[in-house]
């Protein structure tokens, strides 16, 4: 008998408790060797005054287990509340979000029956750092953070995932034609890492045309890797194209822990009616089983689910007259899956988690994994084990031997340190004089600045308004004022001298950003029109 593995389960909000109960019934019926620690997350916790939605005692259980199966939670709208999902992902360093999206044609209606792609999303950085400020009466700001180690970890993960699971192409999507430093860094790292994987094709798309092509022809994509915000949006679009977002699962993988969840939300409008589709959370649970080393149980459960779909036993979100055989609720759907445990689908490709990616002989595992596999019939939703981050092939070896994962530290390369010089500072100010004339503001700032600090630029919402601004440009009360030093500063004292002079003149300083060059190359972007 397998040793039971303890995992943490959070039923969540809305339809969460209903679908969680259904999923746990299926896992128990399949003989999953699991013990559950139930925790409360989300709405009820927010009402207790915990703004993160995660109570302290829940952290202890999650960290001790290293594995969380989470139902959907509701984050209250408005200020003062943090997303539970984002909080858990960032706190536990769950840097990789893996969302497979596959059509189950002809049993679930989809406009794209051939789609079978995986979206791998950076999970910790980008705008989801959630650092926002209201800086003036009219202007708010969000900080977009992108690091080289963060980029390299997720890009390397994507290529190793592709190599391990027989995927042939990795597509990077960014908006680096506009965000040249942040998205530009992600693109550059992608190109650097891609060169190390000559067996995997690679390409890059600007996110807007990439999203359009994904919506129009998802079957042309294989693996997409992208930044946090873009990946969140793209994966929901792709999930809906499969026929229902209720089918989509998400694995959040880190070096010490993992979280598995459905992609959909808490759907409070149908909560308590017993009609919610538990498929997304069930597929997430099979990902969790593979992650924990119970691939045989995961295979039994997923194949039973495929048989249920194949037999036309469908919840209302995927039921179609003439296509489905019977419309059932949440509990009846779970009963149907349980009744089919031990069976394999006849038309849909059965999954083979015990054998890993393909049904090859055990002794040939290592060699087989290193070769691209035929896409046809490739299992689309095997979770990537944290140990695989040393390289994903290690996961397959572990999964075959049915051993639980042991965490490892992901190694990233460190670029050589550049000659970093402080050459100026962007001073952001609040100024709301009549007319909001940039030339007037510039004259005031220049008269207040000390010798050696030259005002070179003023922008408003990123558009140059001084020198030679245009009268048609609309201006708010928020101004970026770029000062350049006549020579590189030896320390921050030059900035303090400038800021002291401006403050003494009555300038309302909101924030500053230092301007650095790295081996002579600017570490900052030009203003629009500069």
Language-model features: where?
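Flexible, glycine/charged-enriched surface loops at secondary-structure junctions
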Residues: 35-38, 165-174, 197-205, 294-302, ...
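Glycine-rich phosphate/nucleotide-binding loop
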Residues: 45-47, 215-300, 307-312
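Buried hydrophobic positions in well-ordered alpha/beta secondary-structure cores of metabolic enzymes
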Residues: 13-16, 66, 120, 158, ...
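Glycine-rich phosphate/pyrophosphate-binding loop and the adjoining helix
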Residues: 130-131, 139-172, 176-179, 308-352
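N-terminal beta-loop-helix "entrance" segment that forms/cooperates
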Residues: 33-55, 212-214
């Amino acid at each position: 008998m397998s040793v039971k593995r303890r995992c943490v389960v959070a039923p969540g909000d809305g339809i969460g408790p209903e679908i969680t109960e259904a999923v746990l019934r299926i896992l128990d019926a399949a003989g999953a060797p699991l013990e559950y620690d139930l925790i409360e997350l989300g709405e009820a916790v927010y009402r207790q005054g915990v703004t993160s939605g995660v109570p302290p005692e829940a952290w202890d259980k999650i960290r001790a287990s290293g594995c969380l199966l989470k139902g959907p939670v509701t984050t209250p709208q408005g200020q003062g509340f943090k997303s539970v999902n984002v909080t858990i992902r960032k706190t536990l360093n769950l840097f990789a979000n893996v969302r497979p999206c596959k059509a189950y044609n002809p049993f679930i209606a989809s406009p794209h029956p051939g789609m079978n792609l995986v979206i791998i999303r950076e999970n910790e950085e980008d705008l989801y750092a959630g650092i926002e400020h209201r800086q003036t009466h009219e202007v708010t700001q969000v900080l977009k953070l992108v690091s080289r180690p963060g980029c390299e970890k997720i890009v390397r993960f994507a290529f190793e995932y592709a190599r391990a699971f027989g995927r042939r192409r990795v597509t990077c999507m960014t908006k680096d034609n506009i965000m040249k430093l942040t998205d530009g860094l992600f693109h550059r790292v992608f190109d650097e890492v891609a060169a190390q994987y000559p067996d995997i094709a690679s390409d890059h798309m600007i996110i807007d045309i990439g999203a359009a092509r994904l919506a129009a022809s998802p079957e042309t994509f294989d693996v997409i890797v992208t930044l946090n915000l873009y990946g969140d949006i793209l994966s929901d679009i792709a999930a809906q194209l499969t026929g229902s977002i209720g089918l989509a699962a998400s694995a959040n993988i880190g070096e010490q822990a993992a979280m598995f969840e459905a992609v959909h939300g808490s759907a409070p409008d149908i909560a308590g009616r017993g009609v919610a589709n538990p498929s997304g959370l069930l597929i997430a649970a099979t990902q969790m089983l593979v992650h924990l080393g119970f691939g045989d149980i995961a295979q039994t459960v997923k194949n039973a689910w495929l048989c249920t779909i194949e037999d036309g036993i469908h919840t209302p979100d995927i039921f179609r007259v003439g296509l489905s055989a019977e419309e059932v609720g949440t509990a009846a759907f779970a009963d149907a899956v349980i009744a089919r445990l031990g069976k394999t689908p006849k038309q849909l490709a059965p999954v083979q988690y015990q054998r890993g990616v393909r049904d090859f002989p055990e002794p040939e595992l290592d060699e087989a994994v290193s070769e691209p596999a035929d896409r046809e019939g490739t299992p689309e939703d095997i979770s990537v084990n944290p140990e695989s981050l040393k390289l994903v092939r290690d996961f397959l070896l572990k999964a075959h031997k049915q051993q639980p994962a042991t965490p490892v530290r992901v190694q990233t390369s460190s670029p050589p340190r550049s000659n970093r010089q402080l050459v100026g500072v962007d001073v952001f100010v609040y100024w709301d004089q009549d007319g909001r004339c940039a030339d007037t503001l510039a004259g005031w700032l220049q008269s207040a600045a000390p010798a050696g600090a030259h005002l070179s630029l003023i922008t408003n919402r990123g558009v140059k308004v001084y020198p030679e601004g245009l009268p048609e440009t609309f201006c708010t009360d928020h101004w970026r004022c770029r000062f350049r030093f006549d020579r590189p500063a030896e320390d921050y004292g030059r900035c303090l001298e400038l800021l002291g002079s401006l403050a003494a003149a009555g300038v309302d300083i909101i924030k500053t950003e230092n301007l650095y060059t790295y081996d002579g190359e600017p570490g900052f972007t030009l203003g629009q029109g500069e």
